[in-house]
């Protein structure tokens, strides 16, 4: 046997024999270390804690602890000083006061666990608590241990004093027997258990009856204190097996009926019994962990509330993101928030004059070919404010000056896009688009009387604004007809400066004829409002009937 031992084990055996332990005592101690059948988790299956090489002592540890005279330390006491004096726990005094055979067995069980490796015992107790859903608060209430110290000892193997470990092991042994009795009770005795539980609840609500019922010689203060602490009801805690069943049922039905909830109760209790290693027919032994229909109903109600709350948070986050993303678009896209690019000391907009090089001229030429007609006009504007349009832009005529743009660059050429789309769908209508000053309308009215009226859409883009524009005054002198159409801009007085753009497509396959007669000359510029008009041939007669003394504001579509 010696040959199978390591050098460390041989040294430990030699130290034990040299300390006065005889061979018979050592063999008897080894026999007592064998696990009992009803102990629960076997200690042999648990690994040893690192660095624990002390051989278990064979002296009866429990009796030396309960009398308060033992000063020696066992394995696990090193570094366990936490600064407080821990007297003999009441649970140990209570077990010492009992002289029954069951109490003797419990004391022997505690002595055996104290002689084992503390880390292995801690893992065994932790596994048992998880298996039966026992909270650490219950251990703290019964043993008087510090919950933080208890948690570190069970999870990390933090060293603990021998007295504290003895109190923990005593609770563990008694809890094992208590749960075993609960599951071993027959169905006939379930009624007695119900009466006892109701009596315990009454004593918990009215503790004065418990004090009156106890005689002076029945039990001392040390024995009654743990009993009063045990009267505290444990909070119900869902086990992992039951939670898995409930979440699967929640995916199928978020609001089950009463019959479905009762079926879930049976299924959960069955799973809890299988988790504890007992028959499902002994579900009444679950005690405070018994699943009821009310608890299932509350679980589903809480899940629905949590889901609704998460959806509300998601909607609020989505709305806030949409608001933040729209604010820059509104600030940059609104026509009333665009800053002017012209200096403040200069006149914003475009100036117009009737003399010298600043004169604004327009000419019109009428060309007929079948049922189509086109009027072209050109306006050359003087640039006053800084221009933001490239001189090489394709919207400028080859021989014309740069168009003055106030308030920023030109908007996208949506008008031309619409014209091109119309030309693809109805090329006949796209040939009748006319852009001319209102003064030219009076001149060409007679020539268009014989033309067939067609419905041609009027296209006018005012940078997305639907407000009326202030007319721009033009001089009414007409010149040669061979000029390209230009777009112009009219600043509004009651709104921010916005670029006005109008475009017209030239007549396809049109024939330009020589100018034979001059249209009527109009010397006074206030006779007609000089707003640029984009219209069709059917609306020319309507425009000619308008009063020449009134202004005709343009509206944007």
UniProtKB/Swiss-Prot annotation:
Membrane-spanning ranges: none
Residue positions where Phosphoserine is found in the record: 49, 52, 75, 80
Key words, A-Z: Activator, DNA-binding, Homeobox, Nucleus, Phosphoprotein, Transcription, Transcription regulation
Occurrences of domain POU-specific atypical (ranges): 93-188
Region (Dimerization): 1-31
Regions recorded as binding DNA: 231-311
Cellular-component GO terms for this entry: cytosol; nucleoplasm; nucleus; transcription regulator complex
One BP term from GO: regulation of pronephros size
InterPro entries documented for this protein: HD, HNF-1, HNF-1_N, HNF-1_POU, HNF1_dimer_N_dom_sf, HNF1b_C, HNF_P1, Homeodomain-like_sf
Positions of the UniProt region annotated as Disordered: 64-85, 324-370
Compositional bias annotation for Low complexity: 328-344
Coiled coil: none
Compositionally biased region (Polar residues): 351-370
Compartments it resides in: Nucleus
GO function term, MF aspect, one: promoter-specific chromatin binding
Principal subcellular localization: nucleus
Function: Transcription factor that binds to the inverted palindrome 5'-GTTAATNATTAAC-3'. Binds to the FPC element in the cAMP regulatory unit of the PLAU gene. Transcriptional activity is increased by coactivator PCBD1.
UniProt similarity note: Belongs to the HNF1 homeobox family.
Oligomer status and interactors: Binds DNA as a dimer. Can form homodimer or heterodimer with HNF1-alpha. Interacts (via HNF-p1 domain) with PCBD1; the interaction increases its transactivation activity.
Protein name per UniProt: Hepatocyte nuclear factor 1-beta
Organism, scientific name: Pongo abelii (Sumatran orangutan)
